Amino acid sequence: MAAPKIFLTGASGYVGGDALHALLAAHPDWESSITVLLRNRSYESVFRTRYPSLNLFFATYDVSDTSAVEAEVAKNEIVLHFAVSADHLPSAQAIVNGLRKRGGAGGIYIHTSGTDVLLDPQVGPEPPEDGVRVLDDWEGISELRSLPDDAPHRDVDKFVLSSGSDTLKTAIVCPSTVYGPGRGLVSQRSAQIPGYTRLILQSGRGLQFADGKTFWNAVHVYDLSRLYVSFVEDAIAPDGRGKATWNEDGYYLVESGIYHWGDIAKRITSEAFRLGLLPSEEVSVLGKERESRDILRPAGRPITNYAVRAEAIRARRLLGWRPVEGTLESEIPNIVRAEARALGLEVRE
């Protein structure tokens, strides 16, 4: 398999850094054919030390750098976009413009979004009378293509979906809560559950939203990264034998199951108490009013979700993707320890 020319953003981030690790673990001979965009020159030495053959491209997404980004993108067959990808339209536009400059040579754009896009801003934090809405990416893909315009990430998703053509293949990878220790060179920390854990530790008590029955999907970062590797391998399959679907049918939800926020609150609190980080295992219940939701903001929007969940079918069916890592609940002890250390708290073993 010839090494594809890949342009990757977000290599210093959590998901992008882990995906880069997975790509080069699976294909170490690809190192010299991958270019990573770095916005911070202070990371140069760590990347050059670990990956001496990796191509480093320093730029931002400011207007002043747009032409340079487009020109660099045009040199590559495949773009994996992680950095600020879900909510930053100018970077997506620069990538599409760059790939279009390749003309008939074509290009592939694998864009990272997030399942927050499934959250309807008009739906309040109440159990729906007509039951939970399940959105899947197979029979339900038309629903994913027509989500409300005011949904999170929606403006960027719409642009990516509309940019596909015969020569420019696009796909949106839409993971839910990502957990697990990252293997990237800079950031190894996720946001939602570590943020929730830190909030509990700093508050000195367990905190739960309402009845604890709100829920969301999750996926381990290693499982997610394996999907990106499979995507790239499929994209360069010889003689057009790839099985992935693209453009309007290139919408891939990523999840390995469901968790309930009340269970997570209790698990964090119990572990923190066991380690001497909290005075009791008691969990304080917060109401549904705006003030309570603001307190819980570090956990992200899904902590108030009763209404919708994702079902990832497309990656399983077409790419043979199967999540194999441990559950989110099993990762809680590691998360509590990591956040305690970051806060300078003494852990009792």
Protein language model features and the residues they cover:
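Terminal hydrophobic/aromatic helix or amphipathic segment near a protein terminus
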Residues: 241-244, 251-310
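Glycine/proline-rich active-site loop of Rossmann-fold NAD(P)-dependent oxidoreductases
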Residues: 180-194, 231-251
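Amphipathic terminal alpha-helices
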Residues: 325-349
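N-terminal Rossmann NAD(P)H-binding glycine-rich loop of SDR-like oxidoreductase domains
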Residues: 3-29
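Conserved beta-loop-beta element that borders a ligand/cofactor-binding pocket
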Residues: 157-184, 194
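A conserved pocket-lining segment of Rossmann-fold NAD(P)-dependent short-chain dehydrogenase/reductase
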Residues: 195-222, 227-231, 244
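Conserved Rossmann-fold NAD(P)-dependent oxidoreductase catalytic core, especially the SDR/UDP-sugar
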Residues: 9, 94-158, 171
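NAD(P)H-binding glycine-rich loop region in Rossmannoid oxidoreductase-like domains
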Residues: 38-101, 113
